[in-house]
Design a protein with these regions (language model features):
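Nucleotide-sugar donor phosphate/pyrophosphate-binding loop at the beta->alpha transition
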Residues: 109-129
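Short N-terminal targeting/anchoring amphipathic segment
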Residues: 5, 64-85, 98, 273
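A conserved mid-protein helix/loop that constitutes part of the nucleotide-sugar donor-binding site
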Residues: 11-18, 199-213
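Conserved donor-binding/catalytic core segment of Leloir-type glycosyltransferases
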Residues: 173-202, 221-223, 346-347
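A charged, aromatic-enriched C-terminal amphipathic alpha-helix characteristic of glycosyltransferases
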Residues: 11, 326-365
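A short, active-site helix/loop in glycosyltransferases that binds the activated sugar's phosphate group
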Residues: 126-172, 176, 357
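Active-site proximal beta-strand in glycosyltransferases
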Residues: 74-76, 92-113
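Nucleotide-activated donor-binding/catalytic signature segment of Leloir-type glycosyltransferases, i.e.
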Residues: 236-258
Length: 365
């Protein structure tokens, strides 16, 4: 079996690459991924042959890239956010038929976004026209599947997948667990993480209004704003200005410097509360790290994520009720809930479970 993975450079690319090389025969897999756009990108990972047997192909080597698409037995499209790869895959029906589109969330929720950018419009056009011919589809949240079928007429065989995270690296989960077990809410400054990126779907402005009543309280707001879609810098500045207006500069910490996976996990593990006011499935890697670290989590109950966590037994708080809480109820995390959530996230992020899901996909494609 010769499988080609098309995956952008993200904070999680290294962990996927290592999963393939440690749990599968790396010689049967190739990764098509370019260099990070910026030196301070969320992908200072430099995938190369030294890290495993899976070959890494730069799409800029065009002839080699196209020959590989033609020769491989299966194509795994890790997210479909832009036209750059799909414009080639869609040229041949046989390429589409051997492709699995792994839906990340943002790639289907673009359907509801209005954009004048020609790249976004072209990507949506290609998805509308050719996604129905893709042979396989995978989701990270099963409730995203009906939306993909409704919006893009996806009809391929469905698989449920999970991605490896930095918390599966040696020793990381134990560090997070130890931190989580020690957490309590005594008289200390409450560290609150808001969102995961500088994207509109984080709904930062709405979340800040929900939190405004706590402005006089002893809390500090950490806002990850390292990346986003094109032009995100302007949105990032708006979020920071509004947060500072409400809470004051001394209580707001914009996170604009990128980190590798382990450093970012360490950052999240220092938080007491995580608020993800996202209006769609997003930030699940961040949420998993936070849950493992004993962080109290708030998400909206109108997203597919809510049903996903609730159905698995997690005790997550509804972000829509934030404005109804007192600061004491906000900062308090029931120890029973915390223990339950930490145990469940260890179960659902078990590397063997993740491996078996990918094994099923590779076997049945």
């Amino acid at each position: 079996m010769n499988i080609t993975h098309i995956m952008a450079q993200t904070m999680y690319t290294q962990d996927m690459y290592m999963l393939i090389n440690t749990c599968f025969d790396g010689t049967e897999h190739k990764f098509c991924t370019g260099h990070a756009k910026r030196k301070d990108s969320l992908a200072p990972i430099g995938l190369n042959q030294a890290k495993g047997n899976a070959e890494v192909i730069n799409p800029k080597h065009f002839i080699r890239y196209i020959k590989n698409l033609d020769a491989c037995d299966a194509i795994i499209l890790h997210g479909l956010f832009n036209f750059k790869h799909f414009i080639f895959i869609s040229r041949k029906k046989e390429w589409l038929e051997k492709t699995c589109w792994v839906i990340w969330g943002g790639d289907i929720y673009r359907y509801n976004e209005k954009s004048n950018r020609w790249g976004v419009k072209l990507t949506e056009y290609l998805k509308q026209k050719y996604a129905c011919q893709i042979g396989y589809v995978a989701t990270l949240v099963d409730k995203d599947l009906p939306l993909a079928r409704q919006w893009y007429h996806v009809g391929g065989k469905h698989f449920s997948l999970s991605y490896p995270l930095p918390i599966q690296r040696p020793g990381v989960m134990q560090k997070l667990t130890d931190k989580g077990n020690k957490k309590g809410f005594g008289k200390k400054t409450v560290k609150v993480m808001l969102g995961n990126s500088a994207t509109l779907t984080n709904c930062h402005m709405d979340a800040l209004q929900e939190l405004a009543a706590f402005a006089p309280e002893d809390m500090k707001l950490y806002i990850p704003l390292t990346y986003g879609f094109k032009g995100y810098e302007e949105y990032r500045e708006m979020v920071v200005q509004e947060a500072v207006r409400i809470f004051g500069e001394h209580k707001v910490v914009p996170v604009t410097e990128s980190m590798d996976g382990e450093a970012y996990s360490e950052f999240i593990s220092d938080m007491d509360i995580g608020i993800f006011y996202n209006d769609r499935q997003q930030a699940m890697g961040n949420i998993a790290i936070a849950l493992a670290s004993g962080v109290k989590i708030y998400i909206r109950n109108d997203t597919t994520m809510w049903g996903n966590y609730e159905g698995r037994g997690f005790r997550i708080e509804n972000a829509f009720t934030l404005s109804e809480e007192t600061f004491d109820t906000f900062r308090y995390y029931d120890p029973v809930k915390k223990e339950n959530n930490m145990a469940l996230i260890r179960k659902y992020t078990d590397i063997n479970l993740i491996r078996d899901k990918w094994k099923q996909l590779f076997t049945e494609m």
